[in-house]
């Protein structure tokens, strides 16, 4: 399949029977059981819970009725739009992150898809912007909701779509006269005089140009603009407050290593932070993307400590389960938990076992099931003890690498032999614990989720209309490594090359780094010696070999920069066109790409 440039894309600019209960059932896990076990009830997505929702409902835009609508009935050009309709949610959010956005007071505010405008009005009141430019293709439909806001002299509505790049670029060119573009060679700095907010949440979602929704595509392109200094990012590092469908937040902000795809890695390269300010409180979607519950607990404890230091508390009535649970368990705060206690996963059978153990003796079938589940729990506990031993042996061996090389070689070989003797599924599960622990133990942790400044505020589906679970992401770009900023034919194209290489890289996440390098192009694997951070524990590497070698999925941004530099310095590297032709075809042939689907990877090459 040939790549086609997407019309909307901006152009490049320059868990033993006597096993301690706490060891397999962390407090955080106990709290989660109540969430993960809940089955969603079938209900309409048009529940009315506020005056704004009632007015929206009366328009009839979201009601599916047979026959033709009345001639004068309100119509929507974008009828899939999800509106924020909860005053309480908006007030809680702005109070929660208020100190953080105070630096934008008096800024230029760009507001895409404001809809009924509740969020827009609240944000305007807090920021008192110099200029507030709104873009909404359904401006006529929503004008009765925005009347008082539109009367302000510093507020302007453009009845065009902020998701169509032609219209967006026109707005940027004509309405942001007080902003100044950064030069191509300059290191971009934070621009607090411009703030972008957008509502990309849709219900129902509809695939578009290979993406699972147009909002997924726009979010993808907003992130790309950071790397290429296009759109708003041409004016410096511009913060973005983006409303997205709740399920889309994990693309940029995964909570487990096997959800860390290319888009999440590139976000780590280009963003100082991505915070989930508010979102649906559930872990159901993570059952296939699990990690040690002790990592989750320790990560949450660290977050609560950061919140305490910053004077942050969750608003009354909007405390999350995690926040409430750990507030009552201060003995866990400040402790090293992961890698010290036997690892545990949130498995559905554990809740079933807990329920059966609380019931009175029943039928023989129930007794057989209970016996089987207890046996499974026993095996899992035994495996957990083995995993803990292996993690600790690995750490002990690593500590010998510099001080006692001979002892390290012996310990490394013995450890690898133990791994080789594990059954395949057991080995695979251990590797997941190993790599997750490796990412978490770096300073700071590699996943942006583990660096969060606060716990997300729980947001209910009925605080939106239609009632679609929606999340607010706070995205703050950072100055990337100079190599990653090289885009376009007038540059070294290192940034372009990085993007193409990562498409191959993240289809082979279980490979050791040196094998992945060799897979990029024959002979490149020999340059592993030019990438010392891969084997340096102080920089997120490991001296372990074989089963203990650093894998692609456990790589950090600094290591990728080193690998890219080695590539750019390699006299035998292929041209950009050769790489594009070979590696994009390989990436497209693999259907397991959550970043984009089908031919949607089409960049404006």
Where are these regions (language model features)?
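Catalytic cores of RNA-modifying enzymes
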Residues: 5-486
């Amino acid at each position: 399949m040939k790549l086609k440039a997407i019309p909307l894309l901006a152009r490049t600019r320059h868990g033993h029977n006597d096993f301690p209960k706490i060891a397999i059932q962390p407090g955080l896990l106990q709290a989660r059981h109540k969430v993960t076990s809940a089955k969603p009830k079938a209900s309409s997505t048009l529940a009315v819970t506020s005056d704004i929702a009632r007015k929206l409902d009366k328009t009839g835009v979201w009601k599916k009725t047979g026959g033709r609508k009345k001639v004068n009935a309100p119509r929507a050009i974008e009828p899939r739009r999800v509106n924020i309709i909860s005053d309480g949610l908006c007030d809680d959010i702005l109070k929660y992150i208020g100190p953080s956005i105070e630096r934008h007071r008096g800024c230029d505010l760009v507001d895409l898809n404001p809809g009924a405008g509740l969020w827009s009005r609240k944000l305007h009141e807090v920021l008192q912007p110099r200029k507030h430019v709104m873009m909404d293709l359904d401006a006529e439909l929503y004008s009765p909701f925005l009347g008082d806001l539109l009367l302000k002299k510093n507020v302007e509505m453009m009845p065009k779509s902020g998701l169509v790049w032609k219209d967006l670029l026109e707005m940027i060119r004509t309405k942001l006269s007080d902003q100044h573009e950064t030069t191509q060679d300059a290191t971009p700095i934070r621009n607090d005089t411009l703030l972008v907010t957008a509502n990309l949440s849709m219900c129902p979602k509809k695939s578009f140009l290979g993406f699972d929704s147009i909002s997924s595509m726009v979010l993808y392109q907003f992130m790309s603009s950071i790397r290429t200094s296009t759109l708003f990012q041409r004016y410096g590092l511009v913060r973005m407050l983006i409303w997205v469908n709740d399920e889309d937040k994990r693309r940029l902000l995964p909570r487990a290593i096997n959800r860390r795809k290319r888009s999440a890695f590139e976000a780590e390269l280009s963003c100082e932070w991505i915070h989930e300010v508010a979102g649906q409180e559930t872990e159901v979607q993570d059952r296939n993307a699990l990690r040690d519950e002790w990592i989750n607990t320790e990560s949450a404890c660290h977050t609560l400590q950061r919140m305490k230091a910053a004077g942050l508390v969750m608003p009354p009535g909007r405390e999350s389960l995690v926040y409430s649970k750990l507030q009552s368990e201060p003995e866990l705060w400040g402790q090293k938990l992961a890698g010290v206690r036997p690892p545990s996963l949130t498995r559905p059978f554990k809740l079933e076992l807990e329920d059966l153990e609380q019931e009175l003796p029943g039928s023989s079938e129930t007794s057989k099931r209970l016996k089987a589940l207890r046996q499974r729990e026993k095996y899992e506990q035994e495996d957990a003890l083995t995993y803990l031993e292996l993690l600790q042996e690995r750490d002990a061996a690593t500590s010998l690498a510099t001080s006692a090389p001979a002892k390290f070689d012996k310990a490394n070989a013995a450890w690898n032999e133990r791994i080789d003797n594990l059954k395949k599924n057991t080995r695979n599960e251990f590797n997941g614990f190993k790599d997750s622990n490796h990412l978490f133990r770096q300073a700071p942790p590699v996943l942006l989720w583990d660096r969060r400044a606060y716990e997300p505020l729980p947001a209910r589906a009925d605080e939106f209309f239609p009632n679609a679970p929606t999340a607010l992401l706070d995205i703050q770009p950072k100055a990337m490594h100079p190599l990653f900023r090289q885009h376009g034919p007038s540059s070294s194209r290192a940034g372009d090359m990085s993007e193409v290489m990562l498409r191959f890289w993240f289809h082979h996440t279980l490979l050791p780094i040196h094998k992945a390098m060799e897979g990029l192009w024959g002979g490149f694997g020999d340059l592993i010696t030019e990438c010392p951070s891969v084997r340096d524990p102080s920089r997120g590497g490991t001296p372990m070999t074989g089963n203990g070698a650093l894998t692609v999925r456990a790589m950090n941004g600094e290591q990728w920069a080193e690998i890219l530099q080695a590539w750019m310095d390699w006299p035998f590297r292929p041209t950009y066109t050769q790489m594009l032709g070979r590696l994009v075809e390989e990436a497209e042939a693999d259907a397991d790409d959550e970043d984009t689907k089908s031919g949607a990877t089409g960049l404006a090459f």
